[in-house]
């Protein structure tokens, strides 16, 4: 096993291990295509794409595992709860950006206060839109509403 796992770039002081999974071309290609690492993406579009994914998957746990599960208003309560959490997350992202990025001369636009503000705005719009899209899918397609019930009952 020691021939497979070795220090990254043969430098034991880096603190990162080079494994067959972490150094494979598939893993590197997959992580390069994530919006956080994709080159040439503006902060607004980066936030929009990350927000859509988060908003889309946040509604499920609130709907199926929330205190109103099994009631007629569970889906609406799940949607409103996910929007509430999205607003809290957006507030936290905004506070982080105001405190962390004070320089305006960074080469990466996401590392500036203005770029982080665009990212946060994109995140808010994308997350509320993703959560709304998931709500509309679950409200109008009954098969999706009952698909996961066997997992939680």
UniProtKB/Swiss-Prot annotation:
Locations listed in the record: Plastid, Chloroplast thylakoid membrane
Matching HAMAP family: PSI_PsaL
Principal subcellular localization: plastid
The organism of origin for this protein: Pyropia yezoensis (Susabi-nori)
Lineage per the UniProt record: Eukaryota, Rhodophyta, Bangiophyceae, Bangiales, Bangiaceae
The keyword Phosphoprotein appears for this protein: no
Keyword Nucleotide-binding assigned: no
Keywords, ordered alphabetically: Chloroplast, Membrane, Photosynthesis, Photosystem I, Plastid, Thylakoid, Transmembrane, Transmembrane helix
Membrane topology annotation: Multi-pass membrane protein
Gene Ontology terms describing biological process: photosynthesis
Annotated TM spans: 73-93, 119-139
CC annotations in GO: chloroplast thylakoid membrane; photosystem I reaction center
The name this protein goes by in its record: Photosystem I reaction center subunit XI
């Amino acid at each position: 096993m020691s021939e497979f796992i070795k220090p990254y770039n043969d430098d034991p002081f880096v603190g990162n291990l080079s494994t067959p999974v972490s150094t494979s071309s598939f893993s590197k290609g997959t992580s390069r295509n994530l919006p956080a690492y994709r080159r040439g993406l503006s902060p607004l579009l980066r936030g929009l794409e990350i927000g859509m994914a988060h908003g889309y998957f946040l509604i499920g746990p609130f709907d199926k595992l929330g205190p109103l599960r099994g009631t007629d208003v569970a889906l609406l309560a799940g949607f409103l709860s996910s929007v509430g959490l999205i607003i809290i997350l957006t507030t936290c992202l905004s506070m982080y950006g105001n405190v962390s990025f004070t320089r305006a001369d960074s080469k990466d636009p996401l590392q500036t206060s203005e770029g982080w503000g665009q990212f946060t705005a994109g995140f808010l719009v994308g997350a509320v839109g993703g959560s709304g899209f998931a709500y509309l899918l679950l409200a109008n397609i009954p098969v999706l509403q009952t698909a996961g019930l066997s997992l939680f009952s």
